[in-house]
Each structure stands twice: as C-alpha cells, then as structure tokens.
C-alpha cells in the first residue's frame, strides 16, 4: 500500500489530503477563504496568499494526523504547481518542497486541471464503476472551462476551451450583478428551480474557428442589458442588504427578495450555460468515440447540470465527483500523482509555480 500526501493552494482554498493506492481517501482537509473574499465580491490575490500562509501548516498537520500517517510512511508528496494565482501556488509549493527536503520523500508536481479529472477517476475506481477510455472530460470551474480527450495512459488532448469567461466565472459575475453576493453561482442554482428556464431567450453567436470552444462573455452582457431594461435597482439593493446583514441567507430569505421575473432570469441564464456545456461536450465525445463522460470542477456541483447530464440519455456512462471533491481539494492532487509515481516521475526541487500552466 502506498500513500501520497496531496497539497493544494492554487486559489482560495488551502487543502491537504492523504490518499492510499489512488482510491482510498484517508483524510481530506480544506480551509476555505470564502468569508475573507466575500466582502470584496471576488478573490483578492494578495489576501489569498496571506491566508494560505496562515493555514498551510495546520492544514497539512491535520491531514497527516487524521490519517495516522507519518512523513516516513509516504511514497510521495504531491503539490499543485499550476495553473492558478502565482502567489497562492508558491505557498503550497514552497511548503511541499520543504517537507520533501526534510523527509527525503519524493516530490511530484501536479497540474490543477488534471487533479479535477482524477477526482472523478478516484471515486469511480473506488465505487467499482471505473471510467472507460477514451473518456471526454469537461472541466468547468471559476477559472477553467475545457474539454479534453483522456486516454487510458493518462495523456490528454485539448478539444475545446473558453475564449473569455469560464463557466463558473460567468455564474459568479451574474450572481454579483443580481445582488446575490459572492460566490453567486450556488445561489443561482438554488433559485433556478423556482423560475421558468425558457422565460428569457438567450442566444449564442456561432463560433468561428474551433466549434468546440466556449464563449460566455456575450451571455453575461445579455443579462446586464436585461437588468438595465427592467428597472431592478430596488430589488438588487434589497438583496445586497440581505447579504450584508446575513452572509448565508436561507432559501426562503432569498425568495422573499427575489421577484418571479428575476427567478425566471436566473433559471434561463442557468439553462443557457448548461445547454452550452452539454452540447459541446456531447459533440466532443462523439468526435473521439468516447466511452465515458467526466464532468468535474466546481461547476459540477450545479444540480441543474447534474440533472440535465443524467437525463440526456447519452450512449456512455456519465461520471460526476461527489460534492466534496468537485471544488478545490487536495485528494484530487494526490490521486493525479499516482500514475506519475508508478512511472517514477518525480519533480526536482527547482520546479516552479506556473500561473498559466496548460495540460495539453
């Protein structure tokens, strides 16, 4: 049995986990910074770095203690090297290097996007429903929206990506525009079932070049224009006041300050994003002859996306991660390192953080 310590600090979560044999999560600890950044309406890179510095030592210590693991029990230390906020990446990477140097345990650098893919592979293998290859991976989060062909040897081919906003970024920006605070995506998801997803018709421009690419900036602008045309200042102010007085309103509180027209708008926006994601994912899967569809990243938490994917009767298995492994975590980083460990692909202590690291 081999254990890997994973460390993740690419954005605004400080995370550590111990995974055994690529499928057993012995511990997974995540320190969120949501309360820190929420008042600013988004992630502030400088604050994120400082919060990582405060959290990294206790988070790693807790992951080791929960799993009853000593450093000398580890086969490797895996750490996110990119993509992400460079200041945040440096905190986790520097600490992982220090542990590796002090303990003599080998270091493995991991691509954050690859980690999201392996979050699904880990759980599918553990649950006895392994992913069949080639697989089509849709990775959708606040910072990424990509389509990859995933081969059995864990090599990748990029098929499509966003040309502007990521899907999760579009959710959060629209949520902020409507007064739902940060992050706004989960609030839209909670309210969407109470609206009509066909009430507001959104159209997407035909993509020039790669038809599998995404673009969400036009949709975001269309929502802005709709808001400007419907005199929504008072209700938006009411929602902002609600968030100011209570950072975590319940559903009834949201519904009390959100008229039917805005519920329809939220439902229609979510429906449009989901349609774009699944339409391009299905086209990509058909192109490569996929035997599985992997949906991962923070947007994989969206209940509407999950329901639509499972209801679409695709001719291959659809795999989502559990909610705990959808958002940023370190178990996925450790899981992604196991194939590299098997190939003895260790990283040197000179490995650098890469804010714009690509997977393929």
Swiss-Prot record:
Its EC number is 2.3.1.234. The keyword Cytoplasm applies. GO terms for molecular function: iron ion binding; N(6)-L-threonylcarbamoyladenine synthase activity. Its cofactor is Fe(2+). Substrate binds at residues 139-143, 172, 185, 189, 302. InterPro entries: ATPase_NBD, Gcp-like_dom, KAE1/TsaD, TsaD. It is found in: Cytoplasm. Gene3D superfamilies: 3.30.420.40. It catalyses: L-threonylcarbamoyladenylate + adenosine(37) in tRNA = N(6)-L-threonylcarbamoyladenosine(37) in tRNA + AMP + H(+). One of its GO terms (biological process) is tRNA threonylcarbamoyladenosine modification. Keywords: Acyltransferase, Cytoplasm, Iron, Metal-binding, Transferase, tRNA processing. Fe cation binds at residues 112, 116, 328. It comes from the Bacteria. Binds 1 Fe(2+) ion per subunit. GO terms for cellular component: cytoplasm. HAMAP family: TsaD. Belongs to the KAE1 / TsaD family. Required for the formation of a threonylcarbamoyl group on adenosine at position 37 (t(6)A37) in tRNAs that read codons beginning with adenine. Is involved in the transfer of the threonylcarbamoyl moiety of threonylcarbamoyl-AMP (TC-AMP) to the N6 group of A37, together with TsaE and TsaB. TsaD likely plays a direct catalytic role in this reaction. PANTHER family: TRNA N6-ADENOSINE THREONYLCARBAMOYLTRANSFERASE, TRNA N6-ADENOSINE THREONYLCARBAMOYLTRANSFERASE, MITOCHONDRIAL. This is tRNA N6-adenosine threonylcarbamoyltransferase. It comes from Solibacter usitatus (strain Ellin6076).
């Amino acid at each position: 049995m081999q254990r890997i310590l994973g460390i993740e600090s690419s954005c605004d979560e400080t995370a550590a986990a111990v995974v055994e044999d690529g499928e057993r999560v012995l511990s997974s600890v995540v320190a969120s910074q949501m309360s820190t950044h929420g008042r600013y309406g988004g992630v502030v890179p400088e604050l994120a770095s400082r919060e990582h510095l405060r959290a990294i030592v206790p988070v790693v210590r807790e992951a080791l203690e929960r799993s009853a693991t000593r450093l000398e029990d580890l086969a490797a230390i895996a750490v996110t090297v990119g993509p992400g906020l460079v200041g945040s990446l440096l905190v986790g990477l520097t600490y992982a290097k220090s542990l590796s140097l002090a303990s003599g345990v080998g270091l493995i650098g991991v691509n954050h996007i690859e980690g999201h893919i392996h979050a699904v592979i880990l759980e599918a293998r553990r649950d006895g429903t392994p992913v069949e290859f080639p697989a089509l991976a849709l990775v959708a989060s606040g910072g990424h929206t990509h389509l990859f062909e995933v081969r059995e040897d864990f090599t990748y081919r990029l098929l499509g990506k966003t040309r502007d906003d990521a899907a999760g970024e579009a959710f959060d920006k629209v949520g902020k525009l409507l007064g739902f605070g940060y992050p706004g995506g989960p609030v839209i998801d909670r309210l969407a079932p109470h609206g009509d997803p066909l009430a507001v018709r959104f159209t997407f421009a035909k993509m020039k070049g790669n038809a599998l690419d995404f673009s969400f900036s036009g949709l975001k602008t269309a929502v802005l224009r709709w808001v400007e045309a419907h005199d929504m200042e008072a209700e938006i102010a009411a929602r902002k006041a609600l968030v100011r007085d209570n950072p975590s309103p319940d559903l009834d509180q949201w519904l009390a300050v959100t008229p039917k027209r805005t519920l329809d708008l939220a439902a229609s926006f979510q429906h449009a994003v989901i349609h774009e994601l699944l339409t391009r994912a299905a086209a990509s899967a058909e192109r490569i002859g996929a035997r599985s569809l992997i949906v991962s990243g923070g947007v994989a938490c969206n209940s509407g996306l999950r329901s639509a994917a499972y209801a679409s009767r695709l001719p291959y298995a659809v795999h989502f991660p559990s909610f705990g492994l959808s958002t940023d975590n370190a178990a996925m980083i450790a899981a992604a390192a196991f194939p590299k460990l098997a190939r003895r692909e260790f990283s040197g202590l000179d490995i650098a953080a890469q804010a714009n690291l690509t997977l393929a």
